[in-house]
Amino acid sequence: MATQRASGLLQRLAQGSLVKQILVGLVLGILLAWISKPAAEAVGLLGTLFVGALKAVAPVLVLMLVMASIANHQHGQKTNIRPILFLYLLGTFSAALAAVVFSFAFPSTLHLSSSAQDIVPPSGIVEVLRGLLMSMVSNPIDALLNANYIGILVWAVSLGFALRHGNETTKNLVNDMSNAVTFMVKLVIRFAPIGIFGLVSSTLATTGFSTLWGYAHLLVVLIGCMLLVALVVNPLLVFWKIRRNPYPLVFACLRESGVYAFFTRSSAANIPVNMALCEKLNLDRDTYSVSIPLGATINMAGAAITITVLTLAAVHTLGVPVDLPTALLLSVVASLCACGASGVAGGSLLLIPLACNMFGIPNDIAMQVVAVGFIIGVLQDSCETALNSSTDVLFTAAACQAEDERLANNALRS
């Protein structure tokens, strides 16, 4: 009897609503951090294991899915990568432009000290682009070990095209391997409530939010701008694409993808989650198996906002005058920097000195701005990743649904 009850409970947990279970884990994590700080720090291991498992499986998932989809691609079957890529770039630039408007409407100032982070940022945009190009010719084993998704994509696409000329047995083997890795991903994702419980507990216990109050205005501007992009700018772009109410799709992506990304704070770790959501939305597998890992690399609306807002906060603090053409140029520079953020250790924060260089701000002061970014990183990085990752699915779904409707309309006319 006890065994039957236990198996019934496990079955309900395995088949229950993952979002509801995550909310329970979130509440329990907050309560544990409030009741016992040492215990909360100890259960942080659960969160570390969960994020580690996602990061471990994501590179293999991308390699196998992309390779399988291209190897088994039928001649004449169309994918929607080009419109998705256009949406990625347009969305990132729109986010940078929104951040400029927000920063001028609600100017922030920083408390800059004489000390700076002992970190060497990229010296220019050319170096960032060079790093991206070099990552394309990375050794495949090295790319998998270091989660270099540009390198993984290049090898997966190349091997996929090569395997098109292979026999059906080989293609079936690759497809079976892809399905096996997908099953492993689903298994890992079921542990999300436990992982988020550990992440929330340890974060509140070790950092807390007391240090964030000194930067409340800056955080409000940053997060407010990200909310504007998530709830206004992105829906407008999706409406332009699908010509109907975009909000059901927007909220589904924020709920199913953004929540995970907020707590894991890793676009790479969220790739399996996004892949599962694309499958749930019944999108074309040949399309999303390429667009999702590509989006995790270049679709960086949140990074563009972070770079723009923190740069203009430094500009306002130092009293540097900014005209409209310079502000527009900053949007372009921030967009380019954001697209290269995944190839830089430290991500968007370490690309701030590139944008600061436009205004003649010395490197030591620019690195102090980076230090401010690290202080508010608990919330900034979480919100940035949630926006970046949920937008990957949103734009992929919008492009796929728009193409499906176009084909359906053409069929009706004929």
From Swiss-Prot:
Keywords: Amino-acid transport, Cell inner membrane, Cell membrane, Membrane, Symport, Transmembrane, Transmembrane helix, Transport. It catalyses: L-serine(in) + Na(+)(in) = L-serine(out) + Na(+)(out); L-threonine(in) + Na(+)(in) = L-threonine(out) + Na(+)(out). InterPro entries: Na-dicarboxylate_symporter, Na:dicarbo_symporter_sf, Ser_Thr_transp_SstT. Gene3D superfamilies: Sodium:dicarboxylate symporter. The keyword 4Fe-4S does not apply. PROSITE patterns: NA_DICARBOXYL_SYMP_1 (PS00713). It is a multi-pass membrane protein. Its main location: membrane. Pfam families: SDF (PF00375). It is found in: Cell inner membrane. GO terms for molecular function: neutral L-amino acid:sodium symporter activity. The chain crosses the membrane at residues 16-36, 46-66, 84-104, 143-163, 180-200, 219-239, 300-320, 332-352. The keyword Phosphoprotein does not apply. GO terms for biological process: serine transport; threonine transport. GO terms for cellular component: plasma membrane. It comes from the Bacteria. Involved in the import of serine and threonine into the cell, with the concomitant import of sodium (symport system). NCBIfam families: PRK13628.1 (NF010151). Belongs to the dicarboxylate/amino acid:cation symporter (DAACS) (TC 2.A.23) family. PANTHER family: PROTON/GLUTAMATE-ASPARTATE SYMPORTER (PTHR42865), SERINE_THREONINE TRANSPORTER SSTT (PTHR42865:SF8). This is Serine/threonine transporter SstT. It comes from Salmonella schwarzengrund (strain CVM19633). The gene is sstT.
